[in-house]
Amino acid sequence: MYELVRALTQGSDHIRHDIPCEDHGQVFESESCKIFAVADGHGDTNCPRSQLGSKFACEIAISEMKVFSTDIIDNSWEKRLISPGKDQDSLIRQLITSIVAKWTTAVNEELEENPLSDEEKSGCKRYIDRYDRGERLEHIYGTTLIAGLLTESYLLLIQQGDGR
């Protein structure tokens, strides 16, 4: 089976303007599977916590894909997963829905514990009104997720985000 290699570098524009890297990546390997997750923070002042959103997305994707992989094996669902159709769609949708729901919970809990600072609010000119109304608060942590799960039987790739 393949080896997973991970590298994360801060872009030259971010270095030049002293902007933190808003991206994150993680890998996990076991005897039965290899998992990777890469999250690309939005790089927008209206999303001042993209760095945290990316970290949460990767951590949750890795965790949920571990559970997914185990469930597929324990329930003998490999054939359902690799055969195109309703069962395949349902299994993959459940995985993505679980990742998004847990990410949304994580960012909402983090925001409740650490409300936006005045400095963060000052950069959120486009969306500050809706943030003040408590709407679309997850956008503060905006990120796009790409993740993969590799086993001896299948490679599953998912992408979530950038649905503008």
What are these regions (language model features)?
Residues 1-164:
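PP2C/PPM-type serine/threonine phosphatase catalytic domain
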